[in-house]
Amino acid sequence: MTVLERLSRAGFRDVTTVEPVTGGLAADAGIAHREHGPPVFVKTFADPPGDDVFAVEAEGLAALRAAGGPATPDVLVADRELLVLTLLRPRPAGEAFWERFAVALAHLHTSTVHPRFGWHRDNWLGQRRQVNTWAGDGFAFFAEHRLLRWLSEPRVAAALGVEGRAALERLCARLPELLPERPACLTHGDLWRQNVLSTEDGQAALIDPAVSYTWAEVDLAHLWTTAPPPEARRFFDVYAELTGLDDGWRSRMPIIQLRQHLAVVAQFDDDWGAAETIRATLAPF
């Protein structure tokens, strides 16, 4: 079934064209232009990885919005085959946008502190299920459900080999020494900068979440996985001022970033250097 047919079945019968958009890695996405209404954002999978993939994404967007942090788009349709959202705008140029985003993200993280790590249901990171079983120990949660869970993936096993696997296991055993003990808070969970857009009035808005309650630094590390644009230089300073984040977070970042690098290696033939980065991070272990 084509995207136009799926949209028509969902009630959008006035769509004339669907303009593909780039930036996403796991799904097909586009802007649906309509005869009698505003354009909307649409997302589909040729072969959905699960029946609940869009339902849990919609729920994640709702949770982020309810927390009063960065904005999220309105969900118009979320079924097995289709996600339709109100259309957001590209990020505006300039430091002011990133400073506003820092304030909103700091509010999200500081206002949602939670006694446990996880989420009330599993969700998805790309086309792989993200296990969110509740845990009281953040180190055990991150080790089991965010790092070691990737070792069963064939591409990860091939990239790491026996020595790399053992190094990752040793690193996980030492997480309480390597990372500070921090509370859980609500996180976006897939916060690379392509998932940061803008509302009409220039406020930061987020898409494509993989929410859970975990360390706030998971979001920061993900945002820094690719070099931030020059206009974002004040983002981290503003965030630190509002949250009390210590200067050592940058040195911890490569360990936390292992999660997204492992996810990339697991899911894509072209890993954009992720396997090499993983091996470099694991080398001391």
What feature does the model see in each segment?
Residues 1-11, 35-38, 283:
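Short, low-complexity, intrinsically disordered N-terminal peptides in bacterial proteins
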Residues 12-19:
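Conserved N-terminal boundary motif of the eukaryotic protein kinase catalytic domain
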Residues 51, 136-143, 182-186, 193, ...:
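Active-site Asp-x-Gly
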Residues 97, 190, 254-257:
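An acidic site on a long C-lobe helix of protein kinase domains
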Residues 47, 78-82, 90-91, 147, ...:
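Short, solvent-exposed loop/turn segments at secondary-structure junctions
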Residues 2-8, 113-188, 199, 241:
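An alpha-helical support segment within catalytic cores of ATP-dependent transferases
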Residues 149-173, 177, 215-218, 222-285:
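A conserved long alpha-helix in the C-terminal portion of kinase-like catalytic domains
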Residues 20-140:
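ATP-binding pocket architecture of kinase catalytic cores
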